[in-house]
């Protein structure tokens, strides 16, 4: 499978620049991000890595905290990961800081991420590896399931309070991801070429959505192969993770920042998506016809709900029309 970038170059008679399979075979570096404040949860995440059925991987635990916390994490690491685990401490910066520090320690042909509130199923890496063997230069996307967990007033996940759900689509769709993120970070395995030679990094300016921004820029360059297996579990905590820690305005501002960043560079779409774009019927003011129709409908609804007189007139008109239709239906 050629990357989208190589397909574009081939259309202009240029040779591929990225379509090179890793010479050493498929191996993984797993980057685990933690603040070190949830040792039990981190231990469970590392336990899930210790039971992987695919053997060729190393683990980089990046502690967003002090060296002392990193030493505690190192001391409590699962013995089954002995020899393949390193712990790195970073300070300062936001959520991207530990991710970028992890990228500096990637040794595998591919890398993937597991936050300390995520759990990997035993076939997590095996599923990635099987797909990567067929498409070594593409991002591999599996399915992540979610489950609500309570912290009972603390910071650690204590017990599940809901059933396991599957809210994310089975297949990656670049156009759908232009509007919102539909892929948790633990659902993805990236080929190392996105950081070398492409040089992608996580954006330090984003307080949240740093994973969505990184995914979109990488996906347009190398493409995404989807596999339908559910291989990881994202535990939605009632306190302490990004969903609950960041305010709604923070999420909204970060969303706008990601869209702005996407808008500053050319967009490379998969083959076939031009037909879907044509179906949105863009108009000359820059919006799609769907957006214009939706805005008009919302404005009309706003007028009706704000003005009892307009609402009453609209209701009377609809009632009169309904009576007329019934009378017409009774006529021979």
Report residues per predicted region.
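N-proximal low-complexity "stem/linker" segments adjacent to membrane-targeting elements
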Residues: 1-48
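Conserved nucleotide-sugar donor-binding catalytic segment
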Residues: 30, 168-255
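Short, acidic, metal-binding catalytic loop of nucleotide-sugar glycosyltransferases
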Residues: 47-56
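Short beta-strand/loop segment that forms part of the nucleotide-sugar
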Residues: 56-68, 86-91
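Glycine-rich, basic loop-to-helix element that forms the pyrophosphate-binding segment
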Residues: 90-106
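Short aromatic/hydrophobic "clamp" motif used to bind/position activated sugar donors
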Residues: 111
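Boundary detector for helix-to-coil junctions that initiate low-complexity/charged tails
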Residues: 256, 260, 264-332
């Amino acid at each position: 499978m050629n990357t989208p970038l190589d397909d574009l170059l081939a259309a202009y008679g240029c040779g591929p620049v990225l379509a090179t399979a890793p010479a050493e075979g498929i191996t993984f570096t797993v980057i685990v991000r933690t603040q070190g404040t949830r040792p039990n949860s981190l231990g469970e995440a590392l336990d899930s890595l210790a039971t992987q059925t695919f053997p060729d991987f190393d683990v980089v635990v990046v502690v967003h905290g002090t060296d002392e916390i990193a030493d505690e994490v190192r001391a409590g690491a699962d013995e089954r990961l002995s020899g393949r685990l390193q712990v790195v401490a970073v300070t300062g910066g936001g959520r991207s800081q530990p991710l970028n520090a992890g990228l500096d320690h990637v040794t595998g042909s591919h890398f993937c991420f597991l936050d300390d509130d995520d759990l990997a199923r035993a076939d997590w890496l095996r599923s990635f590896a099987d797909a990567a063997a067929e498409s070594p230069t593409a991002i591999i996307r599996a399915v992540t399931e979610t489950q609500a967990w309570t912290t009972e007033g603390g910071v650690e996940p204590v017990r599940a309070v809901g059933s396991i759900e599957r809210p994310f689509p089975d297949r990656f769709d670049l156009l759908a991801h232009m509007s919102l993120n539909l892929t948790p970070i633990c659902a993805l395995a990236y080929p190392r070429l996105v950081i070398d030679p492409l040089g992608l990094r996580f954006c330090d300016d984003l307080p949240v959505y740093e994973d969505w921004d990184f995914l979109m820029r990488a996906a347009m360059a190398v493409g995404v192969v989807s596999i339908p297996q559910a291989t990881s579990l994202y535990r939605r905590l009632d306190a302490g993770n990004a969903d609950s820690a960041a305010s709604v305005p923070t999420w909204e501002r970060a969303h706008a920042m990601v869209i702005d960043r996407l808008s500053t560079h050319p967009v490379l779409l998969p083959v076939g998506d031009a037909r879907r774009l044509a179906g949105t019927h863009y108009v000359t003011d820059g919006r799609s016809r769907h957006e214009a129709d939706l805005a008009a409908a919302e404005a009309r609804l706003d007028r009706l709900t704000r003005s009892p007189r307009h609402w009453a007139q609209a209701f009377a008109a609809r009632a009169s029309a309904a009576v007329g239709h019934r009378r017409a239906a009774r006529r021979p």
